[in-house]
UniProtKB/Swiss-Prot annotation:
GO-annotated cellular components: cytoplasm; dynein axonemal particle; extracellular region; neuron projection; nucleus
Gene3D superfamilies (UniProt xref): 2.60.40.790, Tetratricopeptide repeat domain
BP terms from Gene Ontology: cilium movement; determination of left/right symmetry; epithelial cilium movement involved in extracellular fluid movement; heart development; inner dynein arm assembly; neuron migration; outer dynein arm assembly; regulation of intracellular estrogen receptor signaling pathway
Stated role: Involved in neuronal migration during development of the cerebral neocortex. May regulate the stability and proteasomal degradation of the estrogen receptors that play an important role in neuronal differentiation, survival and plasticity. Axonemal dynein assembly factor required for ciliary motility.
Keyword hit for Nucleus: yes
Highest taxon, organism lineage: Eukaryota
Keywords of this entry: Cell projection, Cytoplasm, Neurogenesis, Nucleus, Repeat, TPR repeat
A Pfam family reported for this protein in Swiss-Prot or TrEMBL: CS
Protein name according to UniProt: Dynein axonemal assembly factor 4
Gene from which this protein is expressed: DNAAF4
Subunit structure: Interacts with ZMYND10. Interacts with STUB1. Interacts with ESR1 and ESR2. Interacts with DNAAF2. Interacts with CCT3, CCT4, CCT5 and CCT8. Interacts with DNAAF6/PIH1D3.
Organism encoding this protein: Pongo pygmaeus (Bornean orangutan)
Length: 420
């Protein structure tokens, strides 16, 4: 049972109480102080000090100072008045226990409020930090977008300058051709004048030298007329024999029928043009060419302007939807923009158009399988992705990059991927 301490001293003013409590040689580390507005307890085993205060105090602003084996309390009163005693008198044990329990509940509620306030402050700090990070990321994203836009504008200007240069060069060549044609026409006129002058000179000379030789004069004049008027061109026909296409394939592995079918499909794809598009009337002549649009999309892809590249491929596909490379290149753009389902659709369409499988389209089919497999893996459909990678390896078994990626996918599926 602890020993009650009674040899304390206290003083007061209208606003504060100063309490001095001796520690009796007990180490400061073993001292526990508990204070509320109506209750003060100091536990330093084997001693105990307990005071049921005469009036409420401001326990948040009150202070305790330890020094010289003594604790000095400065207790600020809530109401400015002089106390008759430090602790209330005539209090029974039940009242004391009730005051203790009430003080403990108040302390617990304050601790809970302080914890909630601290958590709220922490959430506010995290929210503020998140908003700052989002703002920084937004600025970085805007900076990157501005850089991309500047690069796109630069590429567009360069393309327009190149087209203007080509137009001027074509005009210059046209002017040169017209000038050469005019010069040739002038030369022909001069030659005709010279021939006419020579014929007149010969006629006059023949009259003067041989006035009686009518027959000889007629012979020379007829010969001169024949020389001055060119004979009409003879009609002829030219027969052209094309060299047959020979594929470098062994006879036992020959795919002549498939290769001929593939060449036939390519020829049909080049002829398949859809000109019934309303926007075509606003386009230049070269912009109506799917090959030119494909090259333009490739240049935009190289400058990381993927949306503009997709627009170029879209128009090219509207003009000619039989070219597999348009779908294959658009799938690469969708992969960069994380449009994974569209990348899968375009890769599948490219594989449909790359039939029958021959050596000439092997590289394109391998790329289509890899891009579709990559999209499947990013959608966490690893089994489907591995199937595409294995199909790509069947086409090109010596591709080391595809081999490494396929092995990684197998490890993910088996749940044994090595930690890097």
């Amino acid at each position: 049972m602890p020993l009650q301490v009674s040899d304390y001293s206290w003083q007061q003013t209208k606003t504060a109480v100063f309490l001095s409590l001796p520690l009796k040689g007990v180490c400061v580390r073993d001292t526990d102080v508990f204070c509320t507005e109506n209750y003060l307890k100091v536990n330093f085993p084997p001693f105990l000090f307990e005071a049921f205060l005469y009036a409420p105090i401001d326990d948040e602003s009150s202070k305790a100072k330890i020094g010289n084996d003594t604790i000095v309390f400065t207790l600020y009163k809530k109401e400015a008045a002089m106390w008759e005693t430090l602790s209330v008198t005539g209090v029974d044990k039940e009242t004391m226990q009730r005051i203790r329990e009430k003080s403990i509940l108040q302390a617990q509620e304050r601790a809970k409020e302080a914890t909630e306030a601290k958590a709220a402050a922490k959430r506010e700090d995290q929210k503020y930090a998140l908003s700052v990070m989002m703002k920084i990321e937004e600025e970085e994203r805007k900076k990157i977008e501005d850089m991309k836009e500047n690069e796109r504008i630069k590429a567009t200007k360069e393309l327009e300058a190149w087209k203007e240069y080509q137009r001027k060069a074509e005009e210059h060549k046209k002017i040169q051709r017209e000038e050469k044609l005019c010069q040739k026409e002038k030369q022909i006129k001069e030659e005709r004048k010279k021939l006419k002058y020579k014929s007149l000179t010969r006629n006059s000379a023949s009259r003067n030298l041989a006035p009686k030789g009518r027959n000889s004069e007629n012979i020379f004049t007829e010969k001169l007329k024949e020389d001055s008027i060119p004979a009409p061109r003879s009609v002829g026909s030219i027969k052209i024999n094309f060299t047959p296409r020979v594929f470098p394939t062994a006879l036992r592995e020959s795919q002549v029928a498939e290769e001929e079918e593939w060449l036939h499909k390519q020829a049909e794809a080049r002829r398949a043009m859809n000109t019934d598009i309303a926007e075509l009337c606003d386009l230049k002549e070269e912009e109506k060419n799917p090959e030119w649009l494909k090259d333009k999309g490739n240049k935009l892809f190289a400058t990381e302007n993927y949306l503009a590249a997709i627009n170029a491929y879209n128009l090219a596909i509207r003009l000619n939807n039989k070219m597999p490379l348009l779908y294959l290149n658009r799938a690469a753009c969708h992969l960069k923009l994380k449009n994974l389902h569209k990348a899968i659709e375009d890769s599948s369409k490219a594989l449909e158009l790359l039939m029958p499988p021959v050596t000439d389209n092997a590289n394109a089919r391998m790329k289509a399988h890899v891009r579709r497999g990559t999209a499947f893996c990013q959608l966490e459909l690893y089994v489907e992705g591995l199937q595409d990678y294995e199909a790509a390896l069947k086409i090109d078994p010596s591709n080391k990059i595809v081999q490494i990626d396929a092995e990684k996918i197998r490890n993910v599926i088996q749940g044994t991927e090595l930690k890097s």
